[in-house]
């Protein structure tokens, strides 16, 4: 197991696939990281040298907002919506869909959670 920015990467997976398991890094960003490091995306995590791992960790830490930082930002945005009492904040508070979806026949799981 390898940990980068608090995210666990499986050693038996290819680098480009393992990086996509990090919250905030998709397939394109994973390929971009591999390209900038000068490594093939097809080699496995366990085949990387300590230097390559350090370089990857440094690059991801500097250039990309990932994992807990991204989740904290999203949570702060939702709390801000709730604090200013905008439409989206009220819908978040009530546990209802916020992008105009109908609630008469759909969104049942959201409405069940409210009744508890």
From Swiss-Prot:
Listed GO CC annotations? mitochondrion; small ribosomal subunit
Gene3D superfamilies per the UniProt record, alphabetical: 1.10.8.50, 30s ribosomal protein s13, domain 2
Q: Which residues form a coiled coil?
A: none
Against SUPFAM superfamilies, the record matches this protein to: S13-like H2TH domain (SSF46946)
* GO biological process, alphabetically ordered: translation
Which GO MF terms are attached to this record? rRNA binding; structural constituent of ribosome
Question: Keywords for this entry?
Answer: Mitochondrion, Ribonucleoprotein, Ribosomal protein, RNA-binding, rRNA-binding
**Subcellular localization, per the record?**
Mitochondrion
Per its UniProt record, what Pfam families does this chain match?
Ribosomal_S13 (PF00416)
PROSITE patterns, per database record: RIBOSOMAL_S13_1, RIBOSOMAL_S13_2
| Function as written in the Swiss-Prot or TrEMBL entry | Located at the top of the head of the small subunit, it contacts several helices of the 18S rRNA.
Task: Write down the HAMAP family for this protein, in alphabetical order.
Answer: Ribosomal_uS13
Q: How does it assemble?
A: Part of the small ribosomal subunit.
The family line of this record is: Belongs to the universal ribosomal protein uS13 family.
The protein's name:
Small ribosomal subunit protein uS13m
Organism taxonomic ancestry: Eukaryota, Viridiplantae, Streptophyta, Embryophyta, Tracheophyta
